[in-house]
């Protein structure tokens, strides 16, 4: 990470990393202005003016106790704190969980703005697949510490597909591009990373466009080829 082994990280290297967790991370009895001296003492490169500007932009009152903030406001505060010390890498763990549709959309806009600066990266752990589809360049599916799938998001959405076939169709199917299959009442569902190949060569079978949720279910519950 950041071009070096994490075991060799210096304090300065660690300050280039920001973290946003599902919890606010701050005591609810504190106000935003109360955490300013904390951030200043924790980070050598804390940019107070930038932090205050973000609080103003995100409409975070400085004199209000954090416990009175909405869930969306708490997430915005976390992001403001996480990026206000020159962070080049942002770790986010289920940070949009529990937010309503509007709050999640605002969060994604904030992250897109953060990524406009060259050299920055975001690592997002989330079970909300629509968020991943909208903002991530790459998708990793991890189960029990094992990477089951790594794919570019655009490729996953454009080239992956779900085939719905009867038993006899499945037997006659060229399985060269089938990643996994699952027994269904009607026959089989099959995950492919070459949807166009099957559309061109098997016009009689039902083929749906791939979605992250479909891929997750098939890679987890289906039988891999």
Predicted segments, located by residue:
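Conserved ABC transporter NBD signature motif
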Residues: 1-8, 12-13
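ABC-family P-loop ATPase nucleotide-binding domains
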Residues: 15, 19-78
